[in-house]
From Swiss-Prot:
Interacts with NOC2. Forms a nucleolar complex with NOC2 that binds to 90S and 66S pre-ribosomes. It is found in: Nucleus, Nucleolus. Belongs to the CBF/MAK21 family. Residues 144-163 have a biased composition (Polar residues). Keywords: Acetylation, Nucleus, Phosphoprotein, Ribosome biogenesis. Residues 1-51, 70-200, 709-729, 863-882, 891-1001 are annotated as: Disordered. The gene is MAK21. Signal peptide: none annotated. The lineage of its organism: Eukaryota, Fungi, Dikarya, Ascomycota, Saccharomycotina. This is Ribosome biogenesis protein MAK21. Present with 15000 molecules/cell in log phase SD medium. Its main location: nucleus.
Amino acid sequence: MSENNGNPLDLSSLRNKISSKLRDNNSKKAKKTHKGKDVKASSNSKKVNEDIRREALALGASEEDLKLIQGLSDDDDAKSEQEFDAVADEDADDKGFKNDLQNFMKNVGFDQHKLEDVDDDDIEEESTSSKESKIPAQEKEHAQSNIASSTIEKTSQESIDNGSEQEENTVEEANLSSDQEPESESAEKEKKEEKDGGLITQTTIISSDKLIIPYDKPWYEIPLDPQVGQNDDVEELSKEQIEKLFERGKQTLEADNQTYYEEFTKDSSQAKFMSQILSDGTLNDKISAVTLLIQDSPLHNTKSLETLVSYCGKKSRNSALQSLNALKDLFLNGLLPNRKLRYFKNQPGLSMMLNKKTLAIFYFEDYLKKLFFRVLEVLEVLSHDPIIHVRLQILNHVFDLLTNQPEQEFNLLRLGVNKIGDIDSKVSSKASYLLLKLEQAHPNMKSIVIDAIVDIALRPNADYHTTYYSVITLNQTILKRSEDSVANKLVKTYFTLFEKFLINTDKDNTNGVVKSNSKSYEEKRKKNFKKGKHGGKSVKIEKTENEVLDEKNSKLFSALLTGINRAFPFAQIPASVYEVHMETLFKITHSSNFNTSIQALVLINQVTVKAKLNSDRYYRTLYESLFDPRLVNSSKQGIYLNLLYKSLKQDALNVERVEAFVKRILQVCSHWLNVGTITGFFFLLIQLAKTVPQIKNLLTNTPVDYEYESDAEEEQGDKDIKRKEYDGRKRDPKFANAEKSSLWEINNFINHFHPTVKTYANAYVTGETEQIAKPDLGLFTLSHFLDRFVYRSAKQTNTARGTSIMQPLFSGSRVNDSVLVKASDIMHDQGPVNTEDWLTKKVEDIKPEDKFFYQYFTTKKTADGKGKKSNKASNFDSDDEMDENEIWSALVKSRPDVEDDSDDSELDFAEDDFSDSTSDDEPKLDAIDDEDAKSEGSQESDQEEGLDEDIFYSFDGEQDNSDKKRSFAESSEEDESSEEEKEEEENKEVSAKRAKKKQRKNMLKSLPVFASADDYAQYLDQDSD
């Protein structure tokens, strides 16, 4: 079988069946002896016994069927197996069977294999030779669509005729010209195998002997004329000569295509089936059929390529997308070589002495290059389709081709980069993501991709949307130390965009701009809003144009600053370039977004240190930023603290400036309630004191030190000399005279309400920093505080953000050690507070922020234990108590004189009905009644109040303990003693209640069963009236 991957029909299975039958027929003498033995053995077998009869009946046979086979022997059964086998004796051959077999083979097309009477020895030799020369066919599996499977199923029966015609027609040698190559060795081997074997060995319809260009190899792997490599030194051909060669190659390819088509369609059923699919089939069937034809031999199916490209130009988006998908698969899977295609005139070694096969291949490559460009034009048109799904699919096709094939990479890159400016953010973000993936797949293309993105970002008519997505694509580019040229290009691009947008958004640059007072149609339409029952204009806080513009600019500036900060360490740019753009960066520090200002300050610090510029202006801006009210609510507090710490460490020689920063830090923190930020600033001061220990002098300075003047100053009393004093309103911290003042602001934090702040402040004053840990700003936020009351484990979140190698710092990184503070709020080692065993912990091991939970849960557990004990003691009579309360309340309602002591009737009632009871029982009964009346109304509230007192009494004790300055351990011991006393009191109360219940039961038993008629006399009189 041929090695072509795209054969239209695969008849190997059918050929194997027929050849096996014929081979068995040719080897009849070899099996003669064995068959004779089998016949003798079958003649000696018995007839159908009773077991076989029962089995036949069980399988559905009837008695009549058994009668039909009663007279048959086993020899008769064996005859059915001898259709293609040898007979028992050659002299006893069935002439009728032989004639039928020959007629069948003649109809099928195997008339050349007539059965002839030959000698046994000759037959044995032929059978052995056929076994030796038999070569198993190689079957290759390749992906086919639904139409391919249906084609094989429908034409499996008709393909037998194709095989017969292939055997009938003798192979004629092609009359090639002098410039044609001889036949390939593979074709000769196949021809010899057909002659030697005498069986069907060719399973393909097309005969490669009639084709000039073989179809069973990729067109770019076919060997060319050897003269191609020898024509490098030949003079260039003229335009007329190239055109002649082009026409010769075109004619050769067209002739070979025609031969291929005739070979493929010489079977009328095959041609009819294919034409029916291409005319009446569905679009999916047509595309699948054409794709299979192209896969067989793209060089011999140029018409199929034209048909598939024509499907891409249909108005239906679905058909266009399906056709483009099929074309993309063809381009990526064997149709294109792993190099750029060449035009015919650009082929190396082009001369007038080349053979037709080489010219045809050169022509096909030229044709394929032009066809690929036509497909790109279709992609460009569909990339502007109004449907987002279509644009996304086209974008995927463009980058698939760009990533896997070098052909037309410049135009493909231009198409992909242009989609960054798409009006829909989904398409823009998808284009940005695919560009970053392209840079990872082809690192050598990084510079080319960046150039294309920069070109679209710096267009004069580029809008904000295009520029923003271009910048966020550039700032995600991964750089290396060796790529300083790429980093320099990025830094220059960022600074250019800075200047462009600062000029456009500068408020002082609005010269001669007059706003039009004319309202648009939409504004006029909105004025006539709906009125009526469900009408009314919704009140929305609409942002002004300046607010929207500022918000957009802050996002763009933030992206630009991120890119500069990432590219700055890799860039090699002289300091003069940075000095030109420093004014731009200082303008950004005064923008409306504080986070953008922080990023600008980070960049200015890097530029100042690396270029060794004057840092006075930077420290003035940083000193001023401490008074910015937006710092309290900023999400970049961690970055700001790290920047402040790094800057003050770098300025260790200017002690006066550092001391001014220390004073202002404490002044600002005294007005804040954010505990996390305050602890962060104190940790900054603790670490800064290790580098600049002179700041501790502020703790010992007093105003008295500067009240006394020197003797030299006393002598100059006539001169008006001002004494230097601290002035916190100075713009420049160098001239604030902080060294002339003392750090009295520290008193507010030593006596702070929060224990953590107090701990850090005391550590700074005393210098005992061994137990002071690096603070986490996220632990003191409101969200973290509320999360502590959620009694469940925290959700496991992925620390990695995206697939980029550039990730934010996390707690396990090595770089984390160089960071002053963090704001992660990651508490992997802590579970819910209700799951911890607080009773087993010591008071000394409790953290300051966990004292509340320690007291709460320890008290609650002790209260729950007491409640369980009291419930066990009172469970046996709880139901009786409920029943007695209901009975007693019913009696009180029916006999009000039972509880009314002042009424005379009650006295009579008591004397008559309680004559057996003593006088001491009456006050006891009244006391019981009063107690029941109180217990009925406030039974539940007393239980709740008692529970609350049990749970929360320790907080009152905590307040008393703090007033009396007792330690926590002493208060816990006193609480245990008070709890024991309460237990004794509760036991006494329970025993007293039980005694009262017994008295009540005795009183109820002494009451009469029936009431007297005198008590209801008034009601009886009313009924009689």
